[in-house]
C-alpha cells in the first residue's frame, strides 16, 4: 500500500491569490483584471481591492490565503459536517486548544525515529467526544503538514464517514476480513495531507477482527506512508475493542467530557489500558 503520491499532492503553494480564486470559480479573468487595475492605481493589496469592488467576500480571500500557505480550511458550502470545527473555524478558541494538544502530542508521543506514529483515542462511555476529538485532531495535524490518517475502528457505531462525507462501502472491517485494499483509504479532497479509512460495514464480530494479526500488520504498512495515524474507538466500558486497539497502537489518549464523564470509569479504563501494556499518553 503506497498512497503517498496519490494522497499528498500540494498544488497552491506560491500561487497568486487571483489565480487561486479564478481556479476555484470565485473570480472571472475579467474581474481579476479590474482588481489588478484598482490595486495598481490605489496601491492596495489584491484582497482589499477585490473586496472593495464587491467581487469577492472576506471569506473568499481567507480561503484563498489558506491554500496559498498550505493551511487549508473549508467554506460553509462544503459537504462535510460542521462538527469539524478545525476545518471550518481554524482560528476559534476551541481549535486553539486542539492545536495546543497537538503540540503536546508531538512533544510527548509522535516520533518517527522511535516508530511512534499511531495513537488510539479512547474513553469509557458514549457521548464523551471521542469521534469529535479524533476527527478534529486529524484535521489540525494535517494542517501542520503531517501526512495524517484517521481510522474509524468503532465498528459498533461508526461516525467518521458521516463527518467527512466519504464512502463507507469499503473500510476497516472489509480490510481485516481480507476483502479490502488500498481503496479503503480515502483522501479528503479539500484538506491537504488528510486521509480517512472508514469503519466499513458493521460486522458481527468486531472484537475478533481487531484481535487478528492482520490488524497489527495493517498498522505497520500504513505507518510507512503516514506520519500520524489516529484511531477512533468504541466506548471502552462497553466493549474490549478499545483496549485491543490501544495495545496495537501502543499508545492511547483518554478523552473526558465535563459534567458527563465519571471519574471512576476513567480510572478503571486507565488501569485496564496500563495492565494491557498500552501507554496512556494523556487525558
Locate predicted features.
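P-loop NTP-binding module
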Residues: 2-42, 52-283
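Short, charged amphipathic recognition helices of the HTH superfamily
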Residues: 45-46
Amino acid at each position: 500500500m503506497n498512497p503517498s503520491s496519490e494522497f499528498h499532492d500540494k498544488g497552491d503553494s506560491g500561487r497568486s491569490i487571483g489565480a487561486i480564486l479564478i481556479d476555484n470559480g470565485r473570480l472571472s479573468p475579467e474581474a481579476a483584471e479590474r482588481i489588478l487595475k484598482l490595486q495598481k492605481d490605489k496601491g492596495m493589496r489584491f484582497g482589499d481591492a477585490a473586496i472593495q469592488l464587491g467581487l469577492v467576500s472576506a471569506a473568499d480571500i481567507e480561503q484563498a490565503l489558506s491554500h496559498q500557505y498550505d493551511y487549508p480550511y473549508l467554506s460553509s458550502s462544503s459537504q462535510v459536517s460542521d462538527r469539524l470545527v478545525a476545518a471550518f473555524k481554524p482560528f476559534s478558541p476551541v481549535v486553539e486548544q486542539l492545536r495546543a494538544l497537538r503540540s503536546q502530542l508531538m512533544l510527548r508521543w509522535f516520533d518517527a525515529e522511535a516508530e511512534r506514529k499511531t495513537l488510539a483515542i479512547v474513553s469509557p462511555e458514549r457521548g464523551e467526544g471521542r469521534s469529535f476529538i479524533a476527527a478534529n485532531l486529524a484535521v489540525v495535524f494535517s494542517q501542520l503538514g503531517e501526512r495524517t490518517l484517521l481510522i474509524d475502528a468503532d465498528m459498533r457505531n461508526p461516525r467518521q464517514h458521516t463527518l467527512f462525507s466519504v464512502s463507507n462501502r469499503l473500510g476497516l472491517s472489509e480490510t481485516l476480513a481480507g476483502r479490502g485494499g488500498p481503496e479503503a483509504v480515502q483522501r479528503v479532497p479539500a484538506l491537504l495531507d488528510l486521509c480517512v479509512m472508514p469503519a466499513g460495514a458493521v460486522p458481527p464480530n468486531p472484537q475478533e477482527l481487531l484481535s487478528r494479526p492482520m490488524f497489527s500488520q495493517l498498522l505497520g504498512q500504513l505507518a510507512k506512508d503516514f506520519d500520524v495515524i489516529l484511531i477512533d474507538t468504541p466506548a471502552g466500558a462497553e466493549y474490549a475493542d478499545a483496549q485491543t486497539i490501544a495495545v496495537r497502537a501502543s499508545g492511547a489518549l483518554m478523552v473526558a467530557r465535563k459534567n458527563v464523564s465519571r471519574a471512576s470509569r476513567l480510572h478503571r479504563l486507565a488501569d485496564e489500558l496500563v495492565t494491557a501494556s498500552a501507554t496512556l499518553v494523556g487525558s
